[in-house]
Amino acid sequence: RPLVREVRTSARLVADETRLYHVTTKIDGWVEKLFTATTGQFVKQGDPLFTIYSPELVTAQQELLTAAQSGLTELTAAARRRLTLWDVNEEQIDRLLASRQIEKTLTLNAPVSGWIVERRFSAGHRAMAGEVLLTLADLSSVWADADIYQSDLAHVRVGMAAELSLPYWPEKRFAGKVTFLSAALDPASRTLKARMEVPNPELLLKLEMFGVARLSYDLGEQIAIPEAAVMRTGERTYAFKDGGDGGD
């Protein structure tokens, strides 16, 4: 009959690196006001995170107003482009042109919905252009890192189905698949790192949780008998067959 073998190994939940988003500023300046920027906090896309004051921003706005007032079309367009490159949106630019009120600070908003997993600044921080200030993680899908022993390596493949269980919810099973196998063994444990992608739509799985990963692979058609029919003496193994005559 067809048989399936199951590989069981411990797994640790980590963030999906393709779902990490860095919040940076594109201009030099100083962080003035913090909104929702606490490590571990959930933010929605578009939520304000913090404001930054930059003399460059003030100068660029003044140049736009001057060019627009003078009717210099090309200079006005260039000034608008500069502001949009600094993440000032078109609505804010139109409001500036209508009110002629220069904004001294720029509000940076969350690019995606997710959890703040790292914050590298406080109010008053001197921020440099390109500096990573916050890191957000979308946890709607997570990675489970597991160690595979050498005896099972021949059967583990990228793309194979995987299942994750947690001691906290023994009745729950989280389906996933293997998406990565390391190119080298760990020199200490002599195991290979395998990564599983596990959908997490209900957000029940949290980073740094530990669980048990199950990987199943087909052994093909094999001769199989019930385990109860096997007797091991230490030196030999015997299999008993029911003759069907009801005798002792």
Predicted stretch roles:
Residues 1-181, 185-193, 197-199, 203-206, ...:
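Periplasmic scaffold and linker elements that assemble and bridge Gram-negative envelope complexes
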